[in-house]
UniProtKB/Swiss-Prot annotation:
There is a cross-link at K32 (Glycyl lysine isopeptide (Lys-Gly) (interchain with G-Cter in SUMO2)). The modification N6-acetyllysine is found at K50. The lineage of its organism: Eukaryota, Metazoa, Chordata, Craniata, Vertebrata. Residues 653-670 have a biased composition (Polar residues). Residues 85-94, 113-125, 548-560, 672-690 have a biased composition (Low complexity). This is Calpastatin. One of its GO terms (molecular function) is calcium-dependent cysteine-type endopeptidase inhibitor activity. Disulfide bonds: none annotated.
Length: 723
């Protein structure tokens, strides 16, 4: 225990001493109110002051710095510390309260005689703290025990020693100085605003309805922290039973409770003891349970009535109807109940006959000699190597699997024994000498070759699926739907058209002939008076073989002519070429305009544009056209601009066409345009007959285009004729 607690406990006991008549009053009356308790707590403080004044002259050795506890402050703090003391005090039992009150009355009676003893003991030195604690511990069980204490107990002596250690209370000097400074005024005013919902009056009506509804609101859990005492448990159990007259023990318990409350009110301000653990409380409560309380409780209960015995004759056995098990046949359990679509059909041959089940081949029992031969095959190296030749070729990359392959080749039926023997042989190869192995191999006989070893493994599973050839749609004409069949080409009358005649291809032309035809423009023959008909044919051949665009007018010199013999050969080749070509027949549909076979649904509507006719010109702009007609200068022509003006050399080239140089001629010679009118007309006709020239749709535009082509083709034809 702390020394402060040791000091506080005896002080409270001393206060209880001189007020014994008050305790007797409590036995007769009910518990008094709080103001009466306060008045009682102030009286012992006055007595304590008188005692301390008597002890003062005898105390010389104590220093002034000792802790002092004024009685005034103790009396003020007493009502505040009631709650603390009640929680820390041990709940007393019913029996222990009676002797306590008696002992306290005796202590209070002997309190007067204890005062001179305190003065005598003050001269001696104060006892040690350890002694005080021992005295206090010995005093606590004295309170709980109902034994009668002596005239002057150890508690009184401890209190006397404790009082001697206390000094006088310090006198507090009141400050009488007056404030002479300026007056302090607080202009700020505070207004109290009550919070919403702090009281029930401030709650809105809608929220009150929600609070009244207790649906879904979990209530607070019951307080299980407070253990019920034996008296509370007895009262709770006996509340259901009604008694005619209350027992004498009930009156005593009420008086004891009133005295306990009065004692707690007086000693609450000073006692600060720790509460005992729960285990000790339970033990004390169990000890305090007496036989008298149990007897009183059992007396309130009535006698137990005996239960009537049951007669076995009155019991009747109930007969349950026995359920009969009926076996219901399920669908598919018998072959008759299986639908015909789902019945298993027996396997049949191609002819439709059912196949007979194959007889299982039973393995022949091996004799002891055969078993020994099979087991000893792995030890014979010569036989093992012969059979190992094939698998070793496959497993050259994996050397670790060679002994297993040997074991597979040697063993035919007993795979397990062979595998064990192969592992044993592979491990014992390095340990067993060669002589022993050879001696063992000589004792073994030779194994006959099995004819089935070299045969490939056949699959025993026979598949029922058969391949059926089905004709695909469109594979034959009969399988093609009538909508998708190809229709024969027919005339307008509905007659089938005859097959088109295949045109005979032109004879293959040699490279020499093509080169001569292409280089004809660069060379001039000796005989310039060649017939016009041959030139026309040659131009047609060249235009068909080579591209239809005119050759560029290059100023490259032709190959030098060695002799007149070459000219004769060229003439002969041209004559042969012209003879091979027949006369061209005129096509009646040649000059007809080309018609579009695609018929467009969109019709082109001709709309007059603004200014296309005189009627569509606005009146504001008509005077401009009138001025131009009268002779006002219009827009300058494109040819008059300096940008588009051509040089005199270019104009001269346009006017006079040039002919290529020949070996006989040293310079370019100008050929007049109207030198050979017949030859030029033939050339223009041949140019117009070429397939590249497209006839325009409009007739007026076609005439203009033909005129322009004739003008451009005239100078080119003149140049070719001269060559």
């Amino acid at each position: 225990m702390n020394p402060t607690e040791a000091k506080a406990i005896p002080g409270s006991k001393q206060l209880e001493g001189p007020h014994s008549p008050n305790k007797k009053r409590h036995k007769k009356q009910a518990v008094k109110t709080e103001p009466e308790k306060k008045s009682q707590s102030t009286k012992p403080s006055v007595v304590h002051e008188k005692k301390t004044q008597e002890v003062k002259p005898k105390e010389h050795t104590e220093p002034k710095s000792q802790p002092k506890h004024p009685s005034d402050t103790r009396s003020k703090h007493a009502p505040k510390e009631k709650a603390v003391s009640k929680s820390s005090e041990q709940p007393p039992s019913e029996k222990s309260t009676k002797p306590k009150t008696k002992s306290q009355d005796e202590i209070s009676g002997g309190g007067k005689s204890a005062v001179p003893a305190v003065a005598a003991a003050a001269s001696a030195e104060p006892a040690d703290k350890n002694k005080e604690s021992k005295l206090l511990t010995s005093a606590v069980p004295v309170e709980s025990k109902p034994s009668k204490p002596s005239a002057k107990s150890d508690m009184d002596t401890a209190l006397d020693d404790l009082i001697d250690t206390l000094g006088e209370p310090e006198e507090t000097k009141e400050d009488t100085t007056t404030y002479t400074g300026p007056e302090v005024s607080d202009p700020m005013s505070s207004t109290y605003i009550e919070e919403l919902g702090k009281r029930e009056v401030t709650l809105p009506p809608k929220y009150r309805e929600l609070l009244n509804k207790e649906e879904g609101i979990a209530g607070p859990p019951p307080d299980s922290s407070k253990p019920l005492g034996p008296n509370d448990a007895i009262d709770a159990l006996s509340s259901d039973f009604t008694c005619s007259s209350p027992t004498a023990d009930a009156k005593k318990t009420e008086k004891e409770k009133s005295t306990e409350e009065a004692l707690k009110a007086q000693s609450a301000g000073v006692i600060r003891s720790a509460a005992p653990p729960k285990e000790k409380r339970r033990k004390v409560e169990e000890d305090t349970m007496t036989e008298q309380a149990l007897e009183a409780l059992s007396a309130s209960l009535g006698t137990r009535k005996p239960r009537p015995e049951l007669d076995p004759s009155s019991i009747k056995e109930v007969d349950e109807a026995k359920a009969k098990e009926e076996k219901v046949k399920k669908c598919g359990e018998d072959e008759e109940r299986v639908p015909s679509e789902y019945r298993l059909k027996p396997a049949t041959d191609k002819d439709g006959k059912p196949l007979l089940p194959e007889a299982e081949e039973k393995p022949k029992p091996l004799s002891e000699s055969e078993l020994i031969d099979e087991l000893s095959e792995d030890f014979d190296r010569s036989k093992c190597k012969e059979k190992q030749s094939k698998p070793t070729e496959k497993n050259r990359g994996i050397p670790g699997r060679c002994p297993r392959a040997c074991a597979r080749g040697c063993a035919s039926d007993l795979h397990v024994f062979c595998a064990v023997s192969s592992t044993h042989s592979s491990s014992s190869e390095g340990m067993v000498p060669d002589d022993a192995v050879e001696a063992l191999a000589g004792s073994l006989g030779k194994k006959e070759a099995d004819p089935e070893d070299g045969k490939p493994v056949e699959d025993k599973v026979k598949e029922k699926a058969k391949e059926e050839d089905r004709e695909k749609l469109g594979e034959r004409e009969e399988t093609i739907p009538p909508d998708y069949r190809l229709e024969e080409a027919k005339d307008k009358d509905g007659k089938p058209l005859p097959p088109k005649e295949v045109k005979e291809p032109l004879p293959p032309l040699s490279e020499d002939f093509l080169l001569d035809a292409l280089s004809k423009d660069f060379t001039v023959p000796s005989d310039t008076s060649s017939p016009q008909f041959e030139d026309a044919k040659l131009s047609v051949v060249v235009s068909e073989v080579v591209s239809q665009t005119p050759a560029p007018t290059t100023q490259a010199a032709g190959p030098p002519r060695d002799s007149a013999r070459d000219n004769k050969e060229l003439d002969d080749a041209l004559d042969q070429l012209s003879d091979s070509l027949g006369q061209r027949q005129p096509d009646p549909d040649e000059h007809k305009p080309v018609e579009d076979k695609v018929k467009e649904k969109a019709k082109a509507e001709h709309r007059d544009k603004l200014g296309e006719r005189d009627d569509t010109i606005p009146p504001k702009y008509q005077h401009l056209l009138d001025d131009n007609k009268e002779g006002t200068p219009g827009k300058p022509k494109r040819s008059e601009s300096p940008r588009h003006q051509r040089s005199p050399r270019h104009q001269r080239n346009l006017q006079v066409p040039r002919t290529p140089l020949t070996p006989s001629q040293g310079t370019w010679t100008a050929v007049p345009q109207l030198q050979k009118p017949q030859q030029t007309q033939q050339r223009t006709k041949t140019r117009s007959l070429l397939p590249s020239d497209k006839a325009p749709r409009n007739g007026g535009k076609a005439k203009d285009s033909t005129k322009a082509k004739e003008e451009t083709s005239k100078p080119k034809a003149d140049g070719k004729s001269t060559s």
